Design a protein with these regions (language model features):
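Active-site beta3 strand of CheY-like receiver
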Residues: 73-79, 84
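Charged docking surfaces used in two-component/phosphorelay signaling
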Residues: 44-52
Length: 164
């Protein structure tokens, strides 16, 4: 299988600065997203989708690693599977929220459980959005764009390298 390098610029629109054409900056270039799922296939699919949009991506396969990586990298957004080994996604979200620098980072719950009661439990744990499996990539992309937009409620807009 051949994967296209999302940093390749041939398909990106050009911006002109000083009369010279330069590749336009990808939509998500300033943002780091942590993707957490215990399925390697889901991690690969979601990560590739995000990288093709220009987002920087880090991954974790369980809740404990998710907390550790979130603390180390301070991502702009977290996509969190709920049914995880070692520490479930709701527990990981609660632990992430204990860290001052991560309190306003949007967490999007991803799960096969779509019941209203389970959604309420996810929001009570501190998630900012909710997606059910199988994942609709268009819906996921729209939710991410909304949560990362400046002034989004529940979100601290902080592109990589810039702290509020």
């Amino acid at each position: 299988m051949v994967l296209k390098d999302p940093r390749a610029t041939s398909g990106l629109p050009k911006q002109k600065r000083d009369g010279v054409s330069h590749p336009a900056q990808p939509v998500g270039a300033d943002f780091l997203i942590l993707v957490v799922d215990d399925s390697a296939d889901n991690l690969a699919m979601i990560s590739l989708n995000l990288q093709q949009q220009g987002y920087q991506v880090v991954t974790a396969g369980n809740g404990e690693d998710a907390v550790r990586i979130a603390v180390q990298t301070e991502p702009n957004l977290i996509l969190m599977d709920i049914n995880l080994p070692s520490l479930d996604g709701l527990g990981a979200t609660r632990r992430i929220r204990e860290h001052e620098a991560l309190r306003d980072v949007p967490v999007v719950a991803i799960t096969a459980f779509g019941t209203e009661g389970f959604q309420r439990a996810a929001y009570d744990a501190g998630v900012a959005g909710y997606l059910t499996k199988p994942i609709d990539l268009d819906r996921m992309n729209q939710l991410i764009a909304r949560l990362l937009s400046p002034g989004s409620s529940g979100n601290l807009y902080k592109p990589i390298g810039r702290k509020p």
